[in-house]
Amino acid sequence: MEIDLAELRRVVEILLNDLEQQGYRTVRLDDDYYWEIPKEDLYSPYAAPKDLAMGQLTHDWERLQEILHGSSSPLAYGLVWLSSLLRAIG
């Protein structure tokens, strides 16, 4: 599969705009810790994951805020942190 980044950006904007139109200015996440499946296991549906790890939403958000405020350089792994937050919101 190949995804156009402009289309991906647009669909994220549409979804976040919809939340704002529903009156949300913030979202509350009551859970903090989650199971993290290693990438090599995540997309292997015919085998059970071997080494689960713990992820933390507050940690992910802190790393993203560092990117937002310029104290950390953008890196592709930021999308992993973002995905954990979007999953929790959804």
Functional labels for PLM-detected ranges:
Residues 1-2, 47, 68, 72:
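Short, charged/polar micro-motifs that form catalytic or ligand-binding hotspots
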Residues 1-33:
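Short terminal alpha-helical segments
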Residues 10, 14-17, 21, 59-66, ...:
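Extended, non-membrane alpha-helical segments enriched in charged/polar residues
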Residues 29-35, 76-80:
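Short, charged, amphipathic alpha-helical segments
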Residues 40-45:
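Extracellular/periplasmic head regions of type IV pilus-like filament subunits
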Residues 61-90:
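Amphipathic alpha-helical binding modules
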